[in-house]
Amino acid sequence: PSNSYLYLYGDMDMEAKLTWLDEHYLSRFDYAWIDSEIKMQKPFEHPVEWKRYYSISNTETEEMNTYLSYNKVVGTSLDEKLYLAFEVLDYALLSAPGAPLKRALTDAGIGKDIMGSYDNGIYQPIFSVIAKNANVEQKEAFVKVIEDTLKDIVENGMDKKALEAGINYNEFRYREADFGGYPKGLMYGLQIMDSWLYDDEKPFIHIEALDTFEFLKAQVGTGYYEELIRKYLLENTHGAIVLIKPEKGRTARMDKELQEKLQAYKESLTEEERKELVERSNALEAYQSAPDAVEDLEKIPVLSREDISKEIEPIINEEKRIADVPVVYHEIETNGIGYVDVLFDMSGVEEADLPYVGILQ
């Protein structure tokens, strides 16, 4: 476990849990120094170009089926301001209604769909602009439109409302912390790794982000975001243009090459080696399909009725009137988010007209 990362989440006796971990797990091992440092990739002297291929069927066309991607490395994930600032820029440039970079590429007829991507879960985050269903011949125009549009934004300034909307959007997601069906503790743990993996002293910089959001709000209209675009997108040589081109029959060709490789390997084995390989394969299959022993299943902890609290959450209703309209106020912890539901009396609507009420949404 010398190279492991352990974290606890929830309301608990932390000292007791850490003591248990030490006595039942960590103390049973000797410490070993593991050189697991993730090295910084040196910047390129000039942006590079990569071409890769994906398979399409013989009935599909290669026309308008290429993916174009403009990619730049943006600092490191240990910079909490950059970590969120480019989330905001991704929204403002490529996702918001009327996003200028997406609109410029769409108006130029490059690709059938434009999207942005910001991978900030790695040591050196990557900001990408992607055109789906484009042509290889559009590569130069793709790069030119992106850089001309970004230069214009740097010279004339970002749309303040788009930046504010991007900040609000990301702050709302942060405060609400709605991870769908995934456990909140698990998702926090994964986000902690965005920084903890690269610096043992900075595990919480991305989950304690309210100060960073306040900083980003204060930078709107100051030239801060325009400078980020200039520094990390326009003048940054650490980037790549990636083309993913369609190729008919690629899957069949690769399957054939694999079969030939496996056949050559098989022929290189002795009869005894082949027999041993079959026996190992059969043993693995038998192990995987064997039912678990009852004593092993009983080791899995389960909840009993006594473990489940019988107390229910209190209902907090405070009735008020605002402008002679009845209001029911619930004072509960929402992490700074206000939720408002407005209800209308529909008793005056004829039953036959009720299906049409949804049109008003």
What are these regions (language model features)?
Residues 56-59, 114-119, 328-330:
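Short beta-strand/turn micro-motifs at beta-sheet edges
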Residues 81-93, 337-361:
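Active/ligand-binding-proximal structured segments within catalytic/core domains
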Residues 1-43, 63-69, 74-79, 91, ...:
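Charge-rich, well-structured scaffold segments of protease-associated domains
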Residues 50-55, 211, 222-231, 324-327, ...:
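Short alpha-helical segments and helix-capping/turn motifs at coil-helix boundaries
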Residues 47-57, 174-178:
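Short, low-order "capping/linker" segments at domain edges
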Residues 45-46, 312:
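Extended assembly/interaction regions that build large supramolecular complexes
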Residues 296-338:
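N- or domain-start disorder-to-order transition segments that initiate the globular core
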